[in-house]
């Protein structure tokens, strides 16, 4: 096992369930002495003589004193999450009891696991590659159906299989080209250049699709920030509360009530939107607190992915709309024009007044056309339906490495077009293989691995 190479011949222990009071807590051990350590504490059965993937009920005892009645799950190597012997102890969910069990394991020879160390051992023991390991972290942090399904698809090897096939094909052709170099004086060609060209063209299309999926993947994983801007008392706080179905922001008839930005999260069709209710933009305010809020609004526009410009259809003019569009366009942000309080003016009259603009007319207070606004928000960030069965890139590290893969494939294709020599072609292939292997972890910097796994929770 590779853990011996990394000096991991010890046994680790950690709480695998969230800290705090609960019905049960699960303590996980992994390593060469996991079974022996638990055997010293669990006297009901000799776990070393039990079959893998079995469950046993009994008491944890230390110095002949009962600690807790537990359920022990046994997973013998290599058929476990880490590829090592793994024992999971299900005890009562008291933090005190959990710590008693953990400390007893440590006294018998285990050490406390580092964040992500169980998954790191699974990676180093070949139970999963680096993309799958990162998908495990994504599942743990997922907070929508779309993010969970996308991460699950990648954890099952959806992304890995694509890279594996490309890598194996490149290695096969690379070996043939390297063989040609050994017979360079005989002018023989083992690698079919036509087939290789077709392979590179296909790989380029697949890589391009993966790169293009990152925009959607980033939305699925991290959500979209939406700044709600407009003049004071346009109804921004009312709209925020309507979208959230609760009274979060202060709503008042007094202009300039929102003195600071208010942020809330809403899930619309599996996409997280971080809605930012901002202070109204009023250039000639003399209120110091309000002026600070206005400045924060400008900053939030710069930081947001989308902008909703909300205006009162009864008081604003076409000139106001043109001014607002100019302000937002200068920031290069996508925006939606939303005319509020249409119930007072009437939708037809409002549409006639602002003809020529793409505007959604609503009544935030009267709950009119809110669903239309939600649909537009989703359409702004998602083209068509989200198909989580397809491989979607959500990780910036993968995206950056795939850009290098795409560039390398272009270099290989250019080399084939220009009939470059085999040695130069082999260099381009090796470069491409390097970046593919960097994604999957076939070659990895130890510092990179430590950084990736440090983001996991302890116990995973």
Language-model-detected regions and their locations in the chain:
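Generic enzyme active-site microenvironment
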Residues: 275, 310, 338
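A glycine-rich (often HGG/GG-containing) alpha/beta subdomain
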Residues: 1-149, 153, 157, 331, ...
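Glycine-rich, N-terminal phosphate-binding loop of Rossmann-like dinucleotide-binding domains
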Residues: 93, 243, 278, 311-314
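Short, Asp-centered acidic motifs that coordinate Mg2+ and/or phosphate
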Residues: 273, 306, 336
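C-terminal-of-GTPase-core extension/linker across diverse P-loop GTPases
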Residues: 3-15, 19, 58, 148-267, ...
């Amino acid at each position: 096992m590779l853990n011996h190479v990394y000096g991991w011949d010890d046994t680790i222990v950690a709480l695998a369930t969230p800290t705090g009071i609960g019905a049960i807590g699960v303590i996980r051990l992994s390593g060469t002495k996991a079974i022996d350590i638990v055997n010293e504490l669990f006297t009901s059965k000799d776990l070393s003589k039990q079959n893998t993937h079995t469950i046993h009920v009994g008491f944890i005892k230390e110095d002949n004193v009962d600690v807790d009645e537990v359920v022990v799950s046994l997973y013998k190597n290599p058929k476990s999450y880490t590829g090592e012997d793994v024992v999971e102890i299900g005890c009562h969910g008291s933090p005190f009891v959990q710590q008693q069990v953990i400390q007893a394991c440590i006294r018998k020879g285990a050490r406390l696991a580092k964040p992500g160390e169980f998954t790191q051992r699974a990676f180093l023991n070949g139970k999963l590659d680096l993309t799958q390991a990162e998908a495990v972290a994504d599942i743990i942090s997922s907070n929508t159906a779309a993010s969970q399904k996308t991460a699950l698809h990648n954890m099952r090897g959806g992304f890995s299989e694509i890279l594996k096939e490309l890598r194996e094909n490149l290695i096969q052709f690379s070996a043939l080209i390297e063989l040609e170099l050994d017979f360079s004086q005989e002018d023989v060609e083992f690698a079919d250049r036509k087939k290789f060209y077709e392979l590179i063209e296909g790989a380029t299309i697949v890589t391009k699709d993966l790169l293009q999926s990152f925009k959607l993947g980033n939305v699925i994983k991290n959500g979209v920030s939406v700044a709600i801007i407009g003049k004071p008392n346009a109804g921004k706080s009312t709209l925020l509360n309507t979208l959230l179905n609760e009274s979060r922001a202060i709503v008042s008839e007094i202009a300039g009530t929102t003195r600071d930005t208010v942020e809330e999260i809403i899930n619309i069709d599996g996409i997280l939107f971080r809605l930012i209710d901002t202070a109204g933009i009023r250039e000639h305010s003399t209120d110091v607190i309000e002026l600070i809020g206005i400045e924060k609004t400008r900053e939030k526009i710069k930081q947001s992915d989308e902008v909703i410009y909300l205006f009162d259809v009864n008081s604003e003019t076409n000139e106001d709309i043109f001014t607002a569009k100019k302000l937002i366009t200068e920031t290069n942000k996508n925006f939606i024009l939303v005319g509020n309080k249409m119930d007072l003016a009437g939708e037809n009259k409002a549409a006639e007044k602002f003809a020529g603009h793409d505007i959604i007319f609503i009544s935030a207070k009267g709950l009119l056309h809110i669903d239309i606004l939600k649909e537009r928000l989703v359409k702004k960030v998602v083209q068509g339906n989200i198909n989580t069965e397809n491989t979607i890139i959500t990780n910036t590290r993968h995206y950056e490495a795939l850009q290098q893969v795409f560039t390398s494939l272009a270099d290989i294709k250019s080399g084939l077009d220009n009939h470059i020599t085999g040695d130069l072609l082999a260099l381009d292939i090796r470069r491409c293989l390097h970046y593919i292997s960097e994604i999957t972890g076939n070659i990895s910097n130890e510092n990179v691995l430590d950084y990736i796994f440090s983001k996991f929770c302890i116990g995973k």
